[in-house]
Amino acid sequence: MVIALDCDNVITNTTACVLAQHYADTGEKLTLDDIKGYYIENYVGDDYKDDFHLIFFKKEMWKRVQVLPHCVEVVKRLHDKGNEIYFVTSTEPQNVAKKARFLQRTFPFLDIRKCLITTHCKQMIGVDILIDDYEMNLINGSYFGILMDYPWNANFDDASDDKIYRVFDWLQVEPMIEYIQTLKNSNENKAITSGDIAKNPSVINSSIIPLLLDDKQIGVVRQIENGVMSGEISLGNLSIEMLQLSDSKYEVKAIRIKH
């Protein structure tokens, strides 16, 4: 499959670093949870709005940026399986060269000269899957979308679009891609609901599926073997990992607070 990856907040923790740099420059402290929409400048103080875009040209800000956990190892496995990997970004032209160098250092097994795409209209690219943190880049595309969960896309009802699936970290990306591959192969674009699972566990024919509650995705369910399922449910800022022991009994394996 042909898989395209957004860069900021999909590969790297860019917004977290922007907020850290903004705090260092101004003393105004904001967290990811404060950013309820895609454009950060809408959430800073009025005194900082006009010049906020200049923060993206500061070397000290970009020095803070780190690759998200498990990203490189998952991309490497996807590449080794024969998938074509592309990076697609709306980076300003003057920053493209720096981003290309960063990507080449981070993903030495790829030739960035052949796989970096810059565009403000991602719907124009012809790929099988786009991974992005901005839901508007996924809507109305010819591709399946994987939405990386953040506060600024929390209000997007991904269950309303049968080609967009939400994940919460890179460990969920690879099995979600496998699930989408299953959908493509079977020409089925319908998510399986928790009710479907309860009525007929055999409907699970891939390693991961979305878990829906009242038509809203609250997590994912993974089949381990012999019909045994594990799952992760997101409730607010709590992530609950569970293992099904029987039809009516679940074991809570871990409860994590998402920051």
What is each of the regions a protein language model found here?
Residues 220, 225-239, 243:
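Acidic, low-complexity, intrinsically disordered interaction modules
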Residues 1-50:
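Active-site neighborhood of HAD-like aspartate-dependent phosphohydrolases
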Residues 188, 192-213, 229-232, 237:
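Conserved active-site motif detector
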Residues 89:
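Conserved phosphate-coupling serine/threonine residues in phosphotransfer and NTP-handling enzymes
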Residues 45-62:
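Conserved non-catalytic scaffold segment of RNase H-like nuclease domains
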Residues 231, 252-255:
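Short linear proline/tyrosine/threonine-rich motifs used for host-factor recruitment
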Residues 59-86, 94-97:
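Short, acidic loop-to-helix structural element flanking the phosphoryl-transfer center
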Residues 92-194:
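C-terminal cap/substrate-recognition subdomain and adjoining C-terminal extension
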